[in-house]
Amino acid sequence: MTTATLLGAEPWSHIGRGSSGVLLIHGFTGSPSSMRGVAQACALAGFHVELPRLSGHGTTVADLVPARWSDWSADAETAYQTLRQRCDRIVVIGLSMGGALTLWLATHHPEIAGIVCINPVAQPLPDEMMSGLESLLRDGVESIPAIGSDIADPSAKEISYDATPVCALHSLFADGVNNFVKSYPSMTVPML
């Protein structure tokens, strides 16, 4: 199921000057809206910019239910390769799950000039929490309430979902973070 992208949740791209670019990756249940201000600042500074909308995000919660780590990592890889066609030097900036995807890209692309991880999902989920997710899946629970925004400014709005699909959350850890965390010691990409 694919529905229309929510207004403000669209991917964003900018052709800059020179040979440097920035890839920005939003977080789980969020949308490109959470990173658009940073993307626009990078564009104003003259950088090439890619800000993709990850699979299942920025539409409806139902679209996120079937999405998995393999979809999001493919989205990040595609955006990286798109930017790579225009740039020699790329910095990747990720928020939350976008931070996990940033770390994943860095483990696969040592040529990345640098990474910035903002509140990254960077550690495996403890066994008891993974067991809890697996129990919810066995019981047929499709989604749980969203964590909610932690933005201090009450007038600031982020386009995100009001529920968290359990299967997608499980995939973030079981198929993603839990598998590449062992690569951290061998990473050579500079990180802020």
Where are these regions (language model features)?
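Active-site signature of alpha/beta-hydrolase-fold catalytic machinery across serine-
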Residues: 104-108
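A catalytic-pocket lid/entrance helix-loop region that shapes and gates access to the active site
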Residues: 131-147
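Serine-hydrolase catalytic core
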Residues: 13-16, 30, 160-192
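Catalytic nucleophile-loop/oxyanion-hole region of alpha/beta-hydrolase
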Residues: 60-86, 91
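Short, surface-exposed "cap/lid" segments of acyl-processing enzymes
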Residues: 3-60
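Gly/Ala-rich beta-loop-alpha elbow adjacent to hydrolase catalytic centers
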Residues: 94-98, 102
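Active-site nucleophile loop of the alpha/beta-hydrolase fold
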Residues: 116-126
